[in-house]
C-alpha cells in the first residue's frame, strides 16, 4: 500500500503541475482496520501530518491559493489566445521561446517556488523542474501532448546532476525539449546566440540522449515510470 501511494503521488505530480500548492510531505497515509466475525475491514485515508495543513510554504490559506491560481490562469489564457490559430509546431516553438525569454534560472536554488509553475510564470525564477512543468502546463492548455521527464543530465563541463525536461508529440512522434538548457545563464553583458536557444528543441534520441539520461525514478520509494519512445532523429 505504501509503494502504491508513493507511485500515485509521483504520477500525480508529473501530470498535474497546476496543483503546485500541495506539500506532499505534509500528507500521511492512514490505514485503519476493524475485525469481526465476518472478517477484517480496512479503511484508508489521507490526512494532514502534525503541521495541520497540506499547503506549501508561502501559501497560508485558501485565499492565497485562489489568488495564485487566478494569476496563473490569466497568464495561461493570454498565451493560449496568442497561439490559438497556429499549427502545433508553431504553438510549441512560440511557447518554448516565451519561456526561454521570460524565465531566469534560479542559481541560488533557495526560492520557495523554485520548482513549480508559480515560480516560473509569476516570479520568473526557477530551476529545471519549474521550466519543465511550465512547458507541460502551457502545452496542455493548447492541446499539444507533453510529458515531464526526470533523470540526469551531463553538461558541457562533464558534470552530471539530477535534471528534468520534456517530451512533446508532433505528427505522432515524440521529441525532446530542454527549456532549461536552452536558457543558459550569462555572466556579464553578453547575449545568448539564437542557435543556443534552440540547441535542445525538438531533438530525437540520437542527439538528445548523448547528454540526457531518463531514469523514470521520481522518488526512492516509488516505481520507475516508462516514458514514450523518442523519435530517433530530430524534428524536421
Residues of each region from the PLM?
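Alpha-helix capping and helix-loop boundary segments enriched in small/acidic/polar residues
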Residues: 1, 63, 122-126, 150, ...
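Low-complexity, Gly/Ser/Thr/Pro-rich intrinsically disordered linker/tail segments
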Residues: 191-236
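Hydrophobic/aromatic-rich core segments of domains that either
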Residues: 130-207
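Non-catalytic propeptide/linker segments at domain boundaries
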Residues: 31-69, 75-79
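Intrinsically disordered, low-complexity N-terminal segments that are enriched in acidic
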Residues: 1-49
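Short, well-ordered strand-loop elements centered on a beta-strand within folded domains, enriched
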Residues: 42-48, 118-119, 123-125, 173-179
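Conserved active-site-adjacent core of cysteine acyl-enzyme catalytic domains
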Residues: 112-126, 130-137
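Secondary-structure boundary elements
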Residues: 61-120
